[in-house]
Amino acid sequence: MSSDRFGLKRFVFSRFAGSLCDQFLLFAVPLAILKATGSLTFSSLAFVIEWLPRILFFPLSGFLADRIKPRFIFFNVEAGRCVLMLVAFLTLTFHPAATFPVLAVMMALLSVAYVLNFVATEALLPRHISAEALPKAHSMLQGVDQTTQVLGPALAVAISVYGGVGAILACAAVLFAVSAINYLFLETHDLEVAEKMSLRSIVQSNITAIQVLKQNKILLHLCALTWVVNLVYGAALVVSAAVILKEFHLPESYFGVLQTSAALITLITFFFVPRIAKRFGLSTLGTLSFCGMILSGALMSLSLDYAMYLAGYALLMAFDGAFSVYLRTLRSQIIPQKHLGKTMGLIGLMNMCSVPVSGLAVTALAGRFMPLQIIAIILVFALILGLMLVIIGRRTFGYNSWLPPVIAQPQA
């Protein structure tokens, strides 16, 4: 099916609307909970509540994406998110004291929708677009994600000035509704599935994914490295709102500037990532990104003012994006293509576990340490664990570089 017949531009538009809403909420919810409760503990606990359903749903989402018509998935996900926004908006309008439970439950349900949308997108494009058009399609989606990371916080600040988190929820409901209606006009074909959907088929799909991991143990090594990176990344996401409001005593608009600046730096970084990988090799890209994240985290933890923290946070997010490119490229050369979906579902589950773990760590430390001290503690732990993994990986798999290089051609 050609991209014109499928409606790639229509799909990208809906992706833009949905991603913009995601960025609205990622900006507004932590601030709303922190302002309502005055506690970093509740803010980090909400982060954990959001991420747990996300990681648990990864294996099932890959299974569903291989069996259900894509248009049906996308429409129902967006329609469900629209209804959820309206319910949250009405509940907070009549019961403003219930901010924490309402927003925590809302984000948990949204995280499930996000995972299904993400995995369904990964399965959709190769089935509806030619191999020659895939790079362009992925570039368009990457551009959408980076653009909304810039626009989202800035627009959320402007909207919240007039109506707080309620106005953001109402705007998100409208955008999700527009996105859902737009998805109805996509031309997607039904999937040919010989095996009926059952608990047994779900279990068998994940058993196959486990076998792939056993046969390619370096994938487990990459998962462990991802854990280390996500510990630092997750801690930065959880703590940043408290750093801005409590340590630097700045208004919440500065949090929007922080997010927008990070997205801009990340967008600029992606122009250099392919050149670095081509000239110096994929392993060098991974090593530079990993070291850059550690140094950026150190800059954050030692920040004396907002400008230092902004620089460290923006660089951390940029290097995290570059490290993700390294991981995705290497995984695609190791995992057999026929098992890519189910294996990525299982890998996604393992990788994402580290993000709520960082939230739990912040929750445990919040009562005894200041936000910047929490970042420093988690950073030191991640550095020690990362160095141990580098040594173990070099000895186990026999490569000479700091991180695993390209070791195989894509498998069929």
Feature roles, as predicted:
Residues 37, 69, 91-92, 249, ...:
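Helix-breaking motifs and short loop linkers at transmembrane-helix boundaries and internal kinks
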Residues 100-107, 111, 136-192, 256, ...:
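Hydrophobic alpha-helical transmembrane segments
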Residues 5, 38-39, 164-165, 215-217, ...:
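Short loop-to-helix capping motifs
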Residues 1-8, 188-224:
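Juxtamembrane intracellular "pre-TM" segments in multi-pass secondary transporters
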Residues 10-26, 50-63, 69-82, 102-161, ...:
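Substrate-agnostic recognition of the 12-TM MFS/MFS-like secondary transporter fold
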Residues 35-36, 66-67, 96, 127, ...:
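Membrane-helix boundary and inter-helical linker elements of multi-pass secondary transporters
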Residues 56, 60, 73, 77, ...:
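C-terminal transmembrane bundle of multi-pass solute transporters/carriers
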Residues 1-53, 216-262:
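Helix-loop boundary and gating motifs at the non-cytosolic
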